[in-house]
Amino acid sequence: MVTVEEVRKAQRAKGPATIMAIGTATPSNCVDQSTYPDYYFRITNSEHMTELKEKFKRMCDKSMINKRYMHLTEEILKENPNICEYMAPSLDARQDIVVVEVPKLGKEAAQKAIKEWGQPKSKITHVVFCTTSGVDMPGADYQLTKLLGLRPSVKRLMMYQQGCFAGGTVIRLAKDLAENNKGARVLVVCSEITAVTFSGPSDTHLDSMVGQALFGDGAAAMIIGSDPLPEVERPLFELVSAAQTLLPDSEGAIDGHLREVGLTFHLLKDVPGLISKNIEKSLIEAFQPLGISDWNSIFWIAHPGGPAILDQVELKLGLKPEKLQATRQVLSDYGNMSSACVLFILDEMRKASSKEGLSTTGEGLDWGVLFGFGPGLTVETVVLHSVST
């Protein structure tokens, strides 16, 4: 007779979880940041608010964003005028868009990841789907399973409305699933569409306009699993450890509320200051076991909440400008895509490392950190180990 302990041992993978493939996708509608203020004030019938428009222009100029992708086109917005009006009841119209489009965009990214992975999709055992919008039953995880034609026995986990830290959360969860289930192959998808947060300008709620200047749409997918099959599966990064923490004295710093008017975001405190003040503690806890204390000796993937967060983190830790190069590149090319950002940055980094002929997927370095920041203030910290290119 076998013991529970023996069964337990047999169920577990031998090695650490690895990221085996990454795929990304965006809507086709590309928005130029330099002309966005004119477009935004025109489409929301707010051109009379000239002072506010100048403020918004300055926000966009300082955003360090070059372009973004958005599902919401001028045509869609003209058909749904309530989405454009500040604080107009519009949740039904928004929901109708996102419950369809979030899984569809997720499917595009997933197909690219599955193709790179090179294994039949029937080998996917788990799905972790993450989005800030479009709560529905059955959810986006179910829709994705149907769209991709995955097995009905695939084990699904749906994460709604976590916010910008959740790119770290999905990696943490997938790591545990892969390491605790022998042979598990976890499809992770973060799909974010801003149709639920888009709204017209308000001179009394400038914090809501920060989001209008920063947020973009995008989806990213990964295949995560332990014990890669030699010659078949080619890991990109190994997942070493993962942690989550709430920052002290940060309650209410970022919050979002789903109401009849859509998902409203509020930035209530000095978010860049709170993050930069506390980030070293998370780094020390994560890297002390590895004997690493030089933050310039590791590669960096940080959620680009906005340029001020990156600037203050860089300053506080004395990071060389090139450390956040991949992070800033994604912010410039796509804006803040909430949970999907850090997956895009991982993709950018491994591609740039290969293109530049560097020795590892992590810019030629062995160890790295991935940070997610978001409502709470919640910080996700993932320690990564790169793979030889």
Curated annotation (Swiss-Prot):
Family named by the database record: Belongs to the thiolase-like superfamily. Chalcone/stilbene synthases family.
Alphabetical list of Pfam families matching this protein: Chal_sti_synt_C, Chal_sti_synt_N
Biological process per Gene Ontology, one example term: polyketide biosynthetic process
InterPro entries: Chalcone/stilbene_synt_C, Chalcone/stilbene_synt_N, Chalcone/stilbene_synthase_AS, Polyketide_synthase_type-III, Thiolase-like
EC identifiers of the protein: 2.3.1.74
Record key words, sorted: Acyltransferase, Flavonoid biosynthesis, Transferase
Protein name according to UniProt: Chalcone synthase 2
Pathway: Secondary metabolite biosynthesis; flavonoid biosynthesis
KW Acyltransferase (keyword) present: yes
Gene Ontology molecular function: acyltransferase activity, transferring groups other than amino-acyl groups; naringenin-chalcone synthase activity
Catalysed reactions, as listed in the record: (E)-4-coumaroyl-CoA + 3 malonyl-CoA + 3 H(+) = 2',4,4',6'-tetrahydroxychalcone + 3 CO2 + 4 CoA
Stated role: The primary product of this enzyme is 4,2',4',6'-tetrahydroxychalcone (also termed naringenin-chalcone or chalcone) which can under specific conditions spontaneously isomerize into naringenin.
Active site, renumbered: 164
Top class in the EC scheme: transferase
